[in-house]
Amino acid sequence: MDDVIVVTSDYVPGHRIVKILGVTWGLTVRSRGLGGNLVAGLRTIAGGEIKEYVTLLNDARETALQRLISSAKAMGATAVINMRFDTSDMAQAMTEIVAYGTAVVTEPVENSQNVTLS
């Protein structure tokens, strides 16, 4: 079991859930730093996207997601269903990002129809 399937739905297409293992999550707390806050403050005056924060949050979400996958693997999961992200500010210069979902064990269903989104 090398890969854990992660989906935002309550099922995994082409698979049957055979066991629910419970809640799994991965989180990270990131500091925006003084320099980032100064640049962001200047950008808010001019308007537009604050690229420093976009990069920070994208990196933090990826870290939280990888930690969720590691946690699910440690539980013996083959998939995580209903995965969500949640973000909250802590103090003035820190942001917490958590990825969470339900760790499950799945097995492939023979002759299943693949879901195609258009």
From Swiss-Prot:
Transmembrane segments: none
InterPro entries: UPF0145_dom_sf, UPF0145_YbjQ-like
A Pfam cross-reference name: YbjQ_1
Recorded family membership: Belongs to the UPF0145 family.
HAMAP family xref list: UPF0145 (MF_00338)
Name of the protein in its database record: UPF0145 protein PTO0347
Native organism: Picrophilus torridus (strain ATCC 700027 / DSM 9790 / JCM 10055 / NBRC 100828 / KAW 2/3)
